[in-house]
């Protein structure tokens, strides 16, 4: 899909750019979150509205893609095969406006001395060059897809936001080469959108921006039919790798604790329906072995998290074992133990 075919919403009313079948691999071209209109360190923005006057809106997403056979209730599985950075322009940009300081806004007065600030970071193979007053720092690239989602059941949702029922701007560093994102399908064809690639991003995206860049994202799409997974009803997007199972808590406007609850609840259900554990067993296993990555924690209610567990400690669903199968009505199948 060409980057020129982009918008600023996850919108089921938009005509598909391309129509593909399950199992199709293709390339999605993207702009950065500033539509590649911030390209010089001399572009400084004392107020956020000055930045918006230049770029119009944040977070262009390329799409939508219609996937034949995807129906409401199914899940769309999107495998990230490769991320090529800087294919449109070989740099990443990060900035802080004078009135939008991220986590440290209003709390760390020394920031005021250096704001606003814009930093243009050239891409050099597997390295991004981060300029500072004491010389250039060379950071290893950690490519990731920041925004990926399907169309909501009704209306449109801003590409800057995120919701459990369709994904969106979840900014999860683990959405990278080799991972598979599983998104709810709400409309026929799913209508997939993708954008906001980062060359690297620190956990929590504390400034509000990462190393924002353009890219060509190679993906493969597949469909997980609802009929093939009875009883398994995801409450939020899922993210798996070769070594982990995971869920993403992403209710826009919710506090961090609630998004942790969403992700843990979904992962408990995954372990129950797919790996033969009771809810209590799954809960206690997660208490012992889960890992939590804070994707975003920029301002009040702007949070998203990724909770994962290693496949090595999860029962293999293909191998039955004594004492591992319990009914939902078992006395110890509810509660925190």
Model regions and ranges:
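Intrinsically disordered, low-complexity linker/loop segments enriched in Gly/Pro
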Residues: 82-176
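A generic structural signal for residues embedded in beta-strands
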Residues: 28, 75-78, 183
């Amino acid at each position: 899909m060409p980057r020129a075919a982009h918008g600023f919403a996850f919108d089921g009313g938009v005509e598909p750019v391309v129509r593909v079948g399950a199992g199709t691999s293709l390339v999605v071209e993207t702009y950065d979150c500033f539509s590649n209109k911030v390209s010089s360190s001399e572009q400084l923005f004392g107020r956020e509205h000055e930045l918006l006057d230049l770029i119009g809106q944040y977070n262009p997403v390329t799409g939508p893609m219609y996937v034949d056979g995807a129906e409401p209730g199914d899940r769309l599985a999107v495998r990230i095969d490769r991320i090529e950075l800087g294919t449109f322009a070989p740099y990443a940009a990060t900035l802080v406006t004078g009135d939008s300081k991220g986590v440290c806004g209003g709390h760390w007065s020394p920031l005021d001395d250096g704001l606003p600030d814009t930093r243009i970071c050239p891409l050099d193979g597997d390295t991004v060059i981060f300029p500072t007053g004491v010389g250039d720092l060379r950071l290893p690239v950690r490519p990731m897809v920041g925004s990926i989602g399907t169309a909501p059941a009704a209306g449109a949702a801003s590409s800057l936001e995120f919701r459990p029922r369709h994904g969106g701007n979840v900014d999860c560093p683990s959405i990278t080469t080799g991972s598979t994102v599983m998104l709810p399908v709400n409309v026929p064809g799913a209508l997939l959108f993708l954008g906001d690639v980062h060359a690297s991003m620190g956990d929590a995206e504390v400034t509000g921006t990462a190393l924002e860049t353009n890219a060509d994202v190679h993906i493969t799409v597949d469909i997980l039919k609802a009929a093939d997974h009875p009883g398994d009803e995801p409450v939020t997007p899922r993210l798996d790798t070769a070594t982990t199972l995971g869920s993403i808590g992403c209710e826009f406007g919710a506090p961090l604790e609630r998004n942790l609850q969403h992700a843990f609840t979904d992962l408990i259900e995954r372990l129950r329906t797919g790996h033969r554990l009771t809810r209590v067993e799954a809960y206690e296993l997660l208490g012992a072995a889960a890992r939590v990555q804070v994707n975003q924690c920029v301002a009040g209610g702007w949070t998203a998290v990724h909770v994962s567990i290693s496949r090595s400690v999860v029962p293999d669903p293909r191998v039955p074992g004594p004492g591992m199968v319990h009914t939902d009505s078992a006395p110890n199948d509810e509660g925190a133990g």
